[in-house]
């Protein structure tokens, strides 16, 4: 299981109810937002919004040059539109980096055989469009997005995988 949260990525390898390995990478969704802010020259808050509303883990050749219009509701100089393909390239590069680091770690520790039934990805970043596709490409294993248990309480909490 891989849990990609805002500030970190936690992972757990478990078979037959036995935990084989756990670990943490200090890379998470906030790093993707920082990359977007830097790469597209937009404020961090706007970068987070772009990631959530328009982000994808896969760069598509459909509609090359398509742009996303930005309202000018923030002070300072910023672009009025950004290239959708560039946004997706930034997201894809960071996610691919995370998955390659994890795959290298699993290979180094001899744990890939424990993952043959597949990988479950959870956390806020798991909601990124096409995340499953990039993970399957890197790991060469089946990947699924984990679902939140049906819990009582704040509605927003239940929407988080």
PLM-predicted stretches and their roles:
Residues 6:
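Short, glycine/acidic-enriched loop or turn micro-motifs at the edges of active sites
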Residues 1, 10-161:
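Helical "lid/coupling" subdomains associated with nucleotide-phosphate turnover
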